[in-house]
């Protein structure tokens, strides 16, 4: 199957929840992915999660840990980029974050730190509250002016955008790169919690979650 055909198929997919999406793309990457560095990847993938708050991954082989995902979400919510905060919340610091941290223990790709930068979250909530049909309710995560800070890790996400449709809050997440095994499982949990946070502030229901990744992949050791 060509990359073009893969794009067309994936852009039309709707899933009830994150677990259904995970299992589908786990098989899809293995069968139709392209070898790309030390991964197998699908390109320009987009899909919809109809029930974003059904955000648990039940795949037994993956052995996803909801307590860790919640700790990571609380870390982001704190706005503190230092891995010591995650250690306090989870009881230990996962080695991957130690590798990504700078000499002071900060991870500048931390979504919470980026989300609160320039009061972006408050701006989004105020914009949606005052103008329901706005197209400006977006949070920028990736910032080219911060390239010098991305020495050990670069944000996988470009931006998060919110739109009110039929009095429900929809959310779109745009990613440059998304590792299905680790990244998607924990990221979708945190993003769905951001969606819920904003919806609660606006006193409305959560709508759909649109997930777009330029490169959705599995590392070779997970294939």
Identify the role of each PLM range.
Residues 2-223:
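Terminal, non-catalytic protein-protein interaction segments that mediate quaternary/complex assembly
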